[in-house]
A protein has these predicted regions:
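Bacterial N-terminal signal peptides that target proteins for export
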Residues: 1-11
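First exposed extracellular module after export/assembly in secreted or surface-exposed proteins
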Residues: 2, 31-147
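Sec-dependent N-terminal signal peptides of Gram-positive bacterial secreted proteins and lipoproteins
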Residues: 12-17
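Bacterial signal peptide processing site
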Residues: 25-28
Length: 147
């Protein structure tokens, strides 16, 4: 029993380090803003001009950009946006998704602002500041509420 108690801390540390190593994503690496595709840099400077790029992570097939105002933008390898997520209670700017989405929100949701938007195969998944999730097709036509 004494031998077991003697080796227990070492065993515990070994297991914890193994779990930590498995949890780390070796594919993500920090890169400079200059290494982003041109279309991603243009997107950030056009729609988020007042924020600075805080950190850029590169994976094999995508980029994740963290802005100084807390907004996170995911881009594919070509630099096209995939997901734009603002901090809680912060509204995203308009203009980078179909105008029909804004038209629907003005008419049916009292103009509620968008907190997160992502591109999906069917179109767009939108989370409003009110917490309501909506789905739109690729043209911006409302499909349904998302549970």
């Amino acid at each position: 029993m004494k031998k077991l108690l003697k080796w227990m801390p070492l065993l515990l540390v070994t297991v914890l380090f193994g779990a930590l190593a498995a949890a780390c994503d070796d594919d993500d690496k920090v890169i400079s803003e200059n290494e982003l595709p041109a279309s991603a840099k243009t997107f950030v400077s056009t729609y988020f001009a007042s924020a600075k790029v805080a950190t850029v992570y590169k994976d094999r097939n995508e980029y994740e950009v963290m802005l100084s105002d807390g907004v996170r933008i995911d881009f594919n390898k070509s630099g096209e946006w995939k997901d734009v997520d603002a901090p809680l209670n912060k509204e995203l700017p308009t203009g980078f998704y179909p105008e029909a989405i804004d038209t629907y929100l003005l008419s049916n949701m009292d103009g509620a602002g968008i907190n997160e938007i992502s591109k999906e195969r069917y179109g767009y998944d939108v989370e409003l500041l009110t917490g309501i999730d909506l789905r739109f097709d690729s043209q911006g036509a409302f499909l349904h509420y998302d549970d």
